[in-house]
């Protein structure tokens, strides 16, 4: 549904969806990385505690920073590495909890969470450092999500099969996940990577667990602990530090 919505938006905006052969191969690889990220996270959440899986996944800013510094000659910065470390610690505090999940395989969960780190880091770097950077953000997001849907469809047919949704309430939930949580977040992610760069985008991505905590407290009446407060403070300091240094430079 998110792909359909973005495609309609692209057509209404006058976007051209034509890709060159070389561009298609790059987009296919990015789609594979994005699909692997989502799939590995699902496996991780099924086998280990959600907080632990999220903490491991949010090591991707560190992976992005290291790749950009050592493979693409991005200027090494102690400020950036310090900010990454602060955001990792903040995410860990926000997601802290038990390791094991009920009826889960801990080893499988840990491996899957680690896979999500590198696949997501590869996707973020790939959007900026390949031919994909020249493709319109809406068009690129449409192709990545569309090809990812095809990959999931094939995977579903070869494993557990597809489950049709019948009731309207579930469709409303799916619609809510498809538009603001998937379509909008993915297209803004691509634009951020192109204009702000992979490293800054990945550090700002640490705001995601912070947002989850805020919604959990004010909407679902979850407890707000000392760990949550410290985690939020560390993430805000990390983001503020990077933005301030970026403006100063």
What is the predicted function of each stretch?
Residues 52-53, 137, 198-201:
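Cytoplasm-facing, short amphipathic helices at loop-to-helix transitions on the intracellular side
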Residues 3-29, 42, 47, 70-82, ...:
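Membrane-interface interhelical linkers
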Residues 1, 56, 79-82, 115, ...:
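Hydrophobic core positions of alpha-helical segments in small-molecule transporters
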Residues 6, 28, 67, 76-98, ...:
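Hydrophobic transmembrane alpha-helices of multi-pass small-molecule transport proteins
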Residues 9, 28-46, 92-93, 111-126, ...:
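Hydrophobic alpha-helical transmembrane segments of multi-pass membrane transport proteins
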Residues 1-4, 55-63, 107, 114-119:
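Membrane-embedded alpha-helical segments of multi-pass membrane proteins
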Residues 9-14, 41, 60-85, 210-229:
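C-terminal transmembrane-helix exit sites in multi-pass transporters
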Residues 3-7, 62, 88, 146-150, ...:
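Small-residue-rich packing faces within the transmembrane alpha-helices of Major Facilitator Superfamily
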């Amino acid at each position: 549904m998110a792909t359909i919505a973005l495609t309609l938006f692209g057509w209404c905006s006058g976007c051209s969806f034509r890709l060159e052969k070389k561009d298609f191969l790059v987009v296919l690889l990015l789609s594979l990385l994005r699909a692997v990220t989502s799939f590995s996270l699902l496996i991780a959440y099924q086998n280990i505690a959600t907080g632990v899986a999220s903490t491991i996944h949010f090591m991707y800013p560190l992976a992005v920073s290291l790749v950009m510094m050592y493979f693409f000659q991005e200027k090494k910065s102690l400020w950036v590495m310090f900010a990454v470390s602060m955001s990792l610690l903040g995410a860990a505090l926000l997601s802290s909890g038990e390791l094991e999940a009920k009826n889960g395989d801990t080893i499988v969960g840990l491996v899957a969470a680690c896979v999500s780190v590198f696949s997501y880091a590869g996707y973020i770097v790939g959007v900026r450092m390949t031919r994909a950077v020249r493709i319109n953000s809406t068009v690129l997001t449409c192709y990545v999500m569309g090809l990812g849907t095809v990959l999931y469809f094939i995977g579903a047919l070869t494993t557990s099969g597809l489950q049709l949704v019948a009731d309207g309430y579930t469709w409303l939930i799916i619609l809510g996940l498809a538009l603001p949580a998937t379509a909008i977040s993915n297209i803004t992610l691509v634009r951020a990577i192109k204009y702000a760069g992979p490293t800054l985008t990945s550090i700002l991505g640490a705001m995601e667990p912070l947002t989850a905590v805020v919604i959990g407290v004010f909407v679902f009446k979850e407890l707000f602990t000392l760990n949550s407060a410290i985690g939020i403070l560390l993430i805000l300091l990390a983001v503020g530090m990077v933005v301030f240094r970026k403006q100063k430079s």
